[in-house]
A protein has these predicted regions:
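Structural motif
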Residues: 106, 149-155, 194-202, 246-252, ...
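Solenoidal tandem-repeat scaffolds enriched in leucines and small polar residues
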Residues: 99-180, 187-193
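Repeated scaffold domains used in trafficking and secretory/extracellular systems
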Residues: 5-13, 43-51, 83-93, 126-135, ...
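Entry beta-strands of beta-propeller and related beta-repeat scaffolds
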Residues: 16-20, 55-58, 95-99, 140-143, ...
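Conserved Ser/Thr-centered positions that define the repeating blades of beta-propeller domains
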Residues: 13, 30, 67-69, 108-109, ...
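Residue-level signature of beta-propeller blades and closely related beta-rich strand-turn architectures
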Residues: 24, 62, 103, 147-148, ...
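Blade-level signature of beta-propeller repeat domains, shared across WD40, Kelch, NHL, RCC1
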Residues: 269-299
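Surface loop/turn motifs at the tips and blade-to-blade linkers of beta-strand repeat domains
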Residues: 1-4, 39-42, 79-82, 119-126, ...
Length: 299
């Protein structure tokens, strides 16, 4: 185990290298067991990093978007036309990239060189929900909202037909993360009030094809206000939480087959992001970042 700087995002590259977005000191990459700073000088925090082969995308505060086509050697830094924080960026190997503003999507088909703005909730006008999380699956985009008393929950947006449908109704919690695991779509949710954060899941084919979607909620070994991040690798699924009153958050294994969320570690501050390599993982936390059982020796 090793702890490092306060951080907001983490990703792993194709060759197993780790890239960390720190809270105050820019981006670092782990090379040959050492962490080296590769990008700094911008004031905005990066809230998510996503890599596809050797291409890395990052998004964050006030619409910042960063991109490297060569594993972090060179970077393009630009801004989306929004003052909102972009919490998620997703992509595929064909060059599709999607990020978000408050109620808008930014969609690219050329690795982020050019962009189209999409308003998925246009018909809801000023009452539209704000976006908190995204997950791309084939040509379907799963959208998780911030807390919204009327339109909160998980939505499914078809990028080909541009049709939108709501697949999970959640009024009093944000959907902070979405992922796909063993043919299920998995949602992490919660709010800053109470201890009702949960992990829920449904069959992905059912969510796309059926009129009614049945969600199952996992039992949590230890209560949390909210779960914040999800990471899956080789059928191993992890989640992280917000910090408790003592300033400590949890790292948990999610066992969908048993319907359980089991605690396996703790981190100082909020567990903003996690990336795993089977059972090994790295957490980007607001108080510290933590490395557990990663195959490369990290100094």
């Amino acid at each position: 185990m090793e702890t490092m700087l306060s951080a907001t995002a983490i990703t792993k590259l194709r060759d197993g290298k780790l890239m960390l977005a720190t809270t105050y000191n820019g981006l670092f990459i782990e090379r040959d067991g050492e962490w080296k700073q590769i990008l700094n000088g911008f004031q905005k925090r990066i809230r998510d990093l996503h890599s596809e082969d050797n291409v890395v995308y990052g998004v964050g505060d006030e619409g910042i978007f960063i991109r490297s086509m060569n594993g972090g050697e060179n970077w393009t830094v630009q801004r989306f036309p929004t003052k909102a924080t972009s919490w998620n960026v997703c992509s595929n190997v064909q060059g599709t990239v999607i990020a978000h503003g408050d109620k808008t999507l930014y969609h690219s088909n050329d690795f982020g060189s050019t962009w189209e703005t999409i308003h998925p909730f246009l018909e809801y006008g000023g009452g539209a929900p704000s976006i908190r999380s995204l997950f791309l699956y084939k040509h379907y985009l799963f959208i998780g909202t911030k807390i919204h008393a009327k339109y909160g929950g998980v939505w499914l947006f078809n990028l080909e037909t541009r049709k939108l449908k709501r697949i999970k109704i959640v009024m009093n919690q944000m959907i902070s993360a979405l992922t796909v695991h063993n043919s299920y779509i998995v949602a992490a949710s919660g709010s800053c009030k109470g201890i009702s954060g949960n992990i829920s899941f449904c069959k992905i084919d059912e969510s796309i094809e059926s009129e009614k979607t049945y969600w199952h909620t996992c039992q949590s070994e230890q209560k949390a206000s909210s779960y914040l991040a999800l990471s899956v690798d080789q059928h191993v699924l992890y989640t992280t939480s917000t910090q408790n009153k003592a300033g400590i958050s949890t790292v948990c294994r999610v066992l969908l087959e048993e319907g359980l969320v089991t605690v396996c570690d703790s981190v100082k501050g909020h567990g903003w992001r996690i990336v795993n390599q089977k059972e090994g993982y790295v957490v980007a936390g607001s108080g510290e970042s933590k490395v557990m059982q990663w195959k490369k020796k990290i100094i």
